[in-house]
Amino acid sequence: MENQKKKKIIKYTKCFKVYEKELTWDLFIKYLNDNMEFCFYLNNITIDIAFHYKNKTKVYELNISSGENKTNLIFNSVDELISFKAFNNKSFYDIWDELEN
């Protein structure tokens, strides 16, 4: 039996109606570039992705928490964020199929 990938479903509200859509890797990258924020779970780890402006420049935040341990990282671009090996020497791309939302 072939291994099936877990689908990540994103829910959002538009004009008071709730929509659901599969969150593919390409859509995830698009939404990050469009200033959407995310929260994922990986085993017992919470992964929050956010953005803010620092001196008029957009920066991306990666906040990782597991119990009392918390890590907060700042990146200058989506490419830097998704390629950084923050998860046991793996990047977001490497762990994409393991993430749950």
Give residue spans per PLM region.
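Short linear motifs embedded in intrinsically disordered, proline/glycine-rich low-complexity segments
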Residues: 1-5, 60-66, 101
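Mixed-charge, Lys/Arg-enriched low-complexity segments
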Residues: 4-13, 70-101
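Amphipathic, interaction-prone secondary-structure segments
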Residues: 29-65
